[in-house]
Amino acid sequence: MRFDVFTIFPGMFTGFLTESILKRAQQAGLIEIAIHNIRDWTTDKHRTVDDTPYGGGPGMVMMAPPIVHAVESVLGQEQNSTPIIIMSPSGELFTQDIARQLACFPRLALICGRYEGIDDRVRIILRARELSIGDYVLTGGELAAAVVIDVVSRLVPGVIDPESLAEESHNSGLLEYPQYTRPPIFRGLGVPEILLSGNHAKIAEWRRMMALCRTAARRPDLLARAALTPRDHELLQRCPPDPFAHQGPVYEGDQLERPEGGEQGASR
């Protein structure tokens, strides 16, 4: 999959795109990310990309010509088949479902706004979709575009283990259950005993219960949309008073950390 990013600050993406999973995905040829400087499509010696808003008001507005020319030049004949996204606080909320939709395309264009926004004719001419990553305002669309790239890239086949994706928050419609690893005791807090039992059926049920309970406590809107089974409703009746409190045993005394091994070794 290819991402084309249009920005006036291309340097903002350098570190983010050259580390961790995104770096490996690019090296493996699973994704390609191209950063385009909108100023390269300006026509004056000052490489101007903004001007004062018609009707008055504070700040500056990004001009339509450089952005439209940049997108049309880069996308060429693929413009009509490529989703064009404008990152904007007034856009629809970016969700995991939208990410799954976008991941089905071989190419995605992301336009990063700045200042007071982008001339609305850009959206109309390019038939662009406006997306927001949350109910807050950033100084520009670059961080938001990076979020979209990260989320969508994870859904490209081969980038992430499919089993890992299935267990993550929002992919199942619920928040994820709490995770633990070694050591089995740290600062007096022990791993929930069910996770050390080796009983995979009970572990799976506990994890499902905790996912349900955490979603009910923190994101009831997600729970209302989830397809719940009769067993899920039974598990919801067993929710602890605070599903975000520590769910394992608590130890007192000097031995606040216990080494690996023995009966308390993590079940794998």
From Swiss-Prot:
Q: Which InterPro entries match?
A: Alpha/beta_knot_MTases (IPR029028), tRNA_m1G_MeTrfase_C_sf (IPR023148), tRNA_m1G_MeTrfase_TrmD (IPR002649), tRNA_m1G_MTases_N (IPR029026), tRNA_MeTrfase_TRMD/TRM10 (IPR016009)
Record has Cell inner membrane as a keyword: no
Q: Which Gene Ontology BP annotations are present?
A: tRNA N1-guanine methylation
Which Gene Ontology terms of cellular component type are present? cytosol
Q: Which reaction does it catalyse?
A: guanosine(37) in tRNA + S-adenosyl-L-methionine = N(1)-methylguanosine(37) in tRNA + S-adenosyl-L-homocysteine + H(+)
Residue ranges of the region described as Disordered: 238-268
MF terms (GO), sorted A to Z: tRNA (guanine(37)-N1)-methyltransferase activity
UniProt entry keywords in alphabetical sequence: Cytoplasm, Methyltransferase, S-adenosyl-L-methionine, Transferase, tRNA processing
| Sites where the protein binds S-adenosyl-L-methionine | 113, 133-138
Locate the coiled-coil region(s) and give their ranges: none
Location(s) in or outside the cell: Cytoplasm
- The answer to keyword Magnesium applying to this record is no
> What is the disulfide pattern of this chain?
none
Query: Which EC number applies?
Result: 2.1.1.228
Kindly give the Pfam families that the UniProt entry links to this protein. tRNA_m1G_MT
Which family is this protein grouped under? Belongs to the RNA methyltransferase TrmD family.
Q: How does it assemble?
A: Homodimer.
State the function annotated in the UniProt record. Answer: Specifically methylates guanosine-37 in various tRNAs.
Under HAMAP family, the record lists: TrmD
This protein's name: tRNA (guanine-N(1)-)-methyltransferase
Q: Which organism is it from?
A: Thermomicrobium roseum (strain ATCC 27502 / DSM 5159 / P-2)
Taxonomic lineage is: Bacteria, Pseudomonadati, Thermomicrobiota, Thermomicrobia, Thermomicrobiales
